[in-house]
Regions:
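C-terminal lobe substrate-recognition/regulatory segment of protein kinase catalytic domains
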Residues: 248-294
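Conserved N-lobe ATP-binding subsite of Hanks-type protein kinase domains
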Residues: 35
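Conserved alphaE helix
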Residues: 68-69, 76, 100-104, 108-162, ...
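Conserved HxN/HPN-centered segment at the entrance to the catalytic loop
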Residues: 79-89
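Activation segment
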Residues: 171-173
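Intrinsically disordered, low-complexity regulatory tails and linkers that flank structured modules
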Residues: 319-395
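Conserved activation segment of eukaryotic-like protein kinases, specifically the C-terminal portion
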Residues: 185-200
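Conserved N-lobe beta3->alphaC-helix segment of eukaryotic protein kinase catalytic domains
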Residues: 47-48, 53-78, 93-96
Length: 395
């Protein structure tokens, strides 16, 4: 037993430095993926990094497949608008940690995430700055043969110089169009509920890049409303909110939707008219931006705007990069969702979410639970991840 312990202590992981080379400064994130820390290089005392702890749910099964996939994808995706993986570090196995090595993914540090910025009432994005954020987000999407599958404001990092970095590829996977008429069988247990597109909510497993474009549309709208525009508590409720905003989900507007697994099992509101422009107009002052949102938040994924057409849309003409740098330079304190107070319920709620509230008592209960929703949402995603792991094939 003593020999085994000594072997574990002395074992050297090639190409994997010890995590002790970095000094943790503060915890800046926590979720289904584990924890994220701001840290600095002990040697230089200057270089700042982000360290993402790999969550070992079941160490008997070895290194998590989701972490392996994330590492592989990040090694392939070297792009200005994708977070940069610097290295993988590990702690030394000793008696004090029960001979369990902890691994960290080490990234270039980004000062803010979009959810944290939107939580701060003192951060005000101009139209040009919103254009610049969306242009960079769509640039991150257009390069992919990858499905990100977790588009949300908290996963959009922004540096102090205004450069956007898409982060958290823990649910991402390589994408290819189905061959020989055999459909893909991807898991639909992905994407945080408030940003999940209707095809996934209805059980589609043969999906593609449009799932990320729906999330991009939700993020774009959120930059004006300052809160997620559809805040359902269940998959059924999320579909109701989508129907109330985008119109009834029927084969007439979405051919083939009735063949999806959950189409007949969900209660889908009837006689709902499409109201995307009507609902967003009070917040989105630019008519071109409102038109782009109308093209991104489309029920039928085959009719949803793709990254290329969205980038060429009139609404993204002449974004103001320098202005966003000046705006962010005014805020020296980092802003992350984890460190921010809960955002108030979205402005959109009174307009198109009334049907989701059953009675005043339920409404009050929802208000009381609102502050706990982020943690509840994280628990849901953990459950989805655990349920779907067998379906997530290796690269």
């Amino acid at each position: 037993h003593a020999q085994k312990q000594k072997y574990i202590e002395d074992y050297n992981f090639q190409y994997c430095d010890e995590a002790s080379k970095y000094e943790k400064i503060a915890k800046i994130g926590q979720g289904t993926f584990g924890e994220v820390f701001k840290a600095k290089d002990r040697k230089t005392q200057k270089k700042i990094v982000a360290m993402k702890k790999v969550l070992m749910d079941n160490e008997k099964e070895g290194f998590p497949i989701t972490a392996l996939r994330e590492i592989k994808i990040l090694q392939l995706l070297k792009h200005e608008n994708v977070v940069n993986l610097l290295e993988i570090c590990r702690t030394k196995a000793t008696l004090s940690n029960r001979y369990k090595t902890t691994f960290y993914l080490v990234f270039d540090f980004c000062e803010h995430d979009l959810a944290g910025l939107l939580s701060n009432i003192n951060v005000k994005f101009s139209l040009g700055e919103i254009k610049k954020v969306m242009q960079q987000l769509l640039m991150a999407c257009i390069i992919f043969t990858i499905l990100h599958r977790d588009m949300k404001a908290a996963n959009v990092l922004i540096t102090k110089t205004g450069i956007l970095k898409l982060a958290d590829f823990g649910l991402a996977r390589p994408f290819s169009f189905s061959k020989n008429s055999a459909p893909n069988r991807y898991t639909n247990r992905v994407v945080t509920l408030w940003y999940r597109p209707p095809e996934l909510l209805l059980g589609d497993r043969n999906y593609g890049p449009p799932v990320d474009l729906w999330g991009a549309g939700c993020i774009m709208a959120e930059m004006w409303t300052r809160s997620p525009i559809m805040q359902g508590n269940t998959e059924q409720q999320q579909l109701t909110l989508i129907s109330q905003l985008c119109g009834s989900i029927t084969p007439e507007v979405w051919p083939g939707v009735d063949s999806l697994e959950l189409y007949t099992k969900m209660e889908l509101p009837r006689d709902q008219k499409r109201k995307v422009k009507e609902r967003l107009k009070p917040y989105v002052k630019d008519p071109f931006a409102c038109d782009l949102l109308d093209k991104l938040l489309v029920l039928d994924p085959s009719k949803r705007a793709d990254s290329d057409s969205a980038l060429n849309h009139d609404s993204l003409d002449r974004p103001h990069a320098l202005r966003s740098v000046k705006m962010l330079a005014q805020h020296t304190q980092s802003m992350f969702e984890y460190l921010a107070p809960p955002r108030r319920p979205g402005h959109m709620r009174p307009h198109h979410q009334q049907a989701a509230v059953i009675n005043p008592t339920a409404a009050r209960a929802q208000q009381l639970l609102r502050r706990k929703w982020l943690s509840r949402s994280s628990i849901l995603v953990v459950a989805f991840l655990l349920l779907s792991t067998p379906a997530l094939c290796c690269l």
